[in-house]
């Protein structure tokens, strides 16, 4: 019998090994996704969960940011809107969209989840608006948003050219320690409230105006509507006209 050459025996052995490996692979179950793939982060949120956002906008999600900020519109005329304690972006979104359609550059924001340092929430929204192209900014808000605006206005620099307070008043725990705190802000202030506001004592807005050393406009209407209720109440036309005139004058 003829003997096989060593080279032929090596070739046969290699072929056998390859056959075994292929067969083993075919019988093995499909490998599970890698641990890294399983931990892939979900896509970052690009808009708030409420409303339909049209036109130019930019959304800063939370997390990773301490509080969410929505920027609407463009240009140098900036407005920061702070909602009530029970609201945020979604609460003021209709107003923000209306202002953006009128040519204003608007920032709306949520309050941080830890319910602390609300002034920092408005400051972050203001900084985001300035970074997005605003040059002159009016801080505005309703109830908590109003008192926080009154409290932080003097600390945010010369870009802040006015404050609109709708049902704002002093609250040491939320960012406006005392009525006298506004004395350090020299810019114009619009103060809107009802005579029988259910949150702050009668005369609060007038006392804030008296403590303010800059120009101020005081609008006090009959009734007990508070914050956003005033924009839809029986004196809404007077209030909205005062807000429009203030924005036109300062921006």
Language-model features: locations:
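Short alpha-helix in the alpha/beta-hydrolase fold that links the catalytic acid
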Residues: 178, 201-210
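Gly/Ala-rich beta-loop-alpha elbow adjacent to hydrolase catalytic centers
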Residues: 141-149
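Conserved alpha/beta-hydrolase
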Residues: 96-115
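Active-site glycine-rich loops that stabilize anionic/oxyanionic intermediates
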Residues: 74-76, 83-87
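Alpha/beta-hydrolase active-site loop
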Residues: 114-132
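The serine-hydrolase catalytic nucleophile loop
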Residues: 85-95, 111
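Short beta-strand/loop motif that positions the catalytic acidic residue
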Residues: 185, 191-193
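N-terminal cap/lid segment of alpha/beta-hydrolase-fold proteins
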Residues: 35-72
């Amino acid at each position: 019998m003829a003997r096989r050459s060593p080279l032929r025996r090596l070739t046969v052995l290699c072929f056998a090994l390859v056959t075994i490996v292929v067969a083993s692979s075919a019988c093995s179950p499909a490998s599970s996704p890698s641990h890294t793939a399983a931990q892939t982060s979900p896509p970052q949120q690009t808009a708030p969960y409420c409303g339909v956002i049209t036109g130019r906008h930019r959304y800063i999600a939370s997390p990773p940011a301490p509080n969410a900020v929505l920027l609407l519109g463009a240009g140098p005329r900036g407005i920061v809107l702070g909602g009530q304690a029970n609201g945020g972006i979604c609460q003021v979104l209709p107003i923000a969209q209306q202002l953006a359609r009128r040519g204003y550059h608007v920032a709306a924001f949520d309050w941080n989840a830890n319910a602390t340092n609300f002034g920092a929430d408005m400051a972050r929204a203001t900084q985001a608006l300035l970074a997005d192209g605003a040059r002159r900014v009016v801080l505005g808000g309703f109830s908590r948003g109003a008192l926080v605006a009154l409290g932080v206005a003097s600390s945010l620099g010369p870009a802040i050219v006015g404050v609109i307070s709708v049902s704002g008043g002093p609250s040491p725990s939320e960012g406006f320690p005392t009525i006298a705190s506004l004395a350090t802000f020299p810019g114009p202030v619009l103060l809107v409230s009802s005579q029988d506001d259910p949150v702050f004592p009668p005369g609060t807005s007038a006392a804030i105006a008296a403590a303010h050393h800059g120009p101020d406009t005081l609008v006090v209407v009959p009734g007990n509507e508070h914050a956003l209720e005033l924009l839809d109440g029986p004196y809404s036309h007077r209030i909205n006209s005062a807000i429009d005139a203030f924005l036109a004058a300062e921006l």
